[in-house]
Amino acid sequence: LDDAQTALTGFGQGQVTATPLQIAMVSAGIANDGVVMNPQMVDAVIGNDLSVIRASENTEFGRAVDAEIADEITSAMVASVSNGAAQGARIDGVDVAGKTGTAENGNRPHTLWFTGFAPADDPAVAVAVVVENGGGQGQSGSGDTIAAPIAKKVIEAVLGR
């Protein structure tokens, strides 16, 4: 990468490619004091008598950042939801940590993102939402107005709110 491409990559543009699962892993790693875990799609396999046939084990993928850095990122993400660019994910009584993204696609509709976790001080859920084709709003939609409210609904469902 040249200097310009490196700069674009630094804020998520250019040649950055990531799946929603990978972005959810980023948020989960921040929520987990900088330690990224391997993703699991199944918590346990249950038999027809409701006994656990096989339970999944949590395994560490690796440390992405020091705990102190993860804490600083968490604070910035909470501020983004509380009074910044990600207010579409605000939930009364819950500190949500989040980050929006609006990827430009030339003259085509934007790709809208939100990733985050909650509660920020004792995380129970990490989420990533991607909405393609501008969520029906062309180039006027944003991660805050389209993707963040979807994430809010998911977080509320997980937290039973």
Label each residue range with its predicted role:
Residues 1-60, 77-161:
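Active-site beta-strand/loop architecture of penicillin-binding DD-peptidases
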